[in-house]
């Protein structure tokens, strides 16, 4: 079976948008999130309205693109007249309400961040937001809808940049590379140093390391204290 040309693939990615246009919805926002699984950092969502007639041939599911490709696509999205909103929920709120509810909060904030209220939402996943806006949940929507794919790229680029900034503040965890996910280096740093202020304390990987990290810190202080004492005599 031959591969579809780029034009055909682009048309496929506009199926849900065109369906919404036929129903009378002019402003269709794609919504996606990133950062549900990491042990550290916020969950970030983006809402993107791609103007009718705009083509973004390089845009695809953010997970299938390299970091450089995502950055390039993000610049294209931001420079082609797309309306973009970003929502962010911090680790303390994730711990308070759970990651699913925090994801919904981030999505709602992203919609609120759009310059013009959308008429219809296309949401990645089988979700429905508590908003009085027509909406459709699309499982694996970032591979099926141009608007959702654009949102996935914007959210991913925004969060990756945030985690690189956090790396400058908390370098021992390697956030510039792992972006908060539970890599071997990250878990080792958690065991050695315990969690930092942007860790999600309700997540199992962080909870499991808390005692070890605190014990290591206490042991280090005890050892340093002994070294600093003067012998009696």
From Swiss-Prot:
Its cofactor is Mn(2+); Mg(2+). One of its GO terms (molecular function) is RNA-DNA hybrid ribonuclease activity. Belongs to the RNase HII family. It catalyses: Endonucleolytic cleavage to 5'-phosphomonoester. GO terms for cellular component: cytoplasm; ribonuclease H2 complex. Its main location: cytoplasm. Manganese or magnesium. Binds 1 divalent metal ion per monomer in the absence of substrate. May bind a second metal ion after substrate binding. Its EC number is 3.1.26.4. Pfam families: RNase_HII. This is Ribonuclease HII. The keyword Lipid metabolism does not apply. A divalent metal cation binds at residues 32-33, 124. PROSITE patterns: RNASE_H_2. Residues 26-215 form the RNase H type-2 domain. Residues 211-233 are annotated as: Disordered. GO terms for biological process: DNA replication, removal of RNA primer; mismatch repair.
């Amino acid at each position: 079976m031959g591969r579809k040309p780029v034009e055909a693939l682009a048309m496929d990615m506009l199926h849900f948008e065109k369906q919404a246009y036929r129903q009378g919805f002019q402003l269709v926002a794609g919504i996606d999130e990133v950062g549900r699984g990491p042990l550290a950092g916020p969950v970030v969502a983006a809402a993107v309205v791609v103007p009718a007639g705009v083509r973004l041939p390089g845009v695809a599911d953010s997970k299938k693109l390299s970091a450089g490709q995502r950055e390039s696509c993000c610049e294209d999205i931001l420079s082609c007249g797309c309306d973009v909103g970003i929502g962010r929920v911090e680790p303390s709120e994730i711990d308070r309400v759970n990651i699913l509810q925090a994801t919904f909060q981030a999505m709602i904030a992203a919609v609120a961040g759009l310059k013009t209220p959308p008429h219809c939402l296309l949401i990645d996943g089988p979700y429905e937001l508590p908003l009085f806006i027509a909406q459709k949940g699309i499982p694996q929507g970032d591979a099926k809808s141009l608007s959702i794919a654009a949102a996935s790229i914007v959210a991913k680029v925004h969060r990756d940049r945030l985690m690189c900034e956090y790396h400058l503040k908390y370098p021992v965890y390697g956030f510039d590379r792992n972006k908060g996910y539970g890599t071997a280096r990250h878990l080792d740093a958690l065991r050695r140093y315990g969690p930092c202020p942007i860790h999600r304390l309700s997540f199992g990987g962080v909870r499991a390391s808390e005692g070890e990290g605190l014990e290591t810190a206490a042991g280090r202080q005890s050892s340093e204290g002994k070294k600093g004492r003067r012998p009696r005599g």
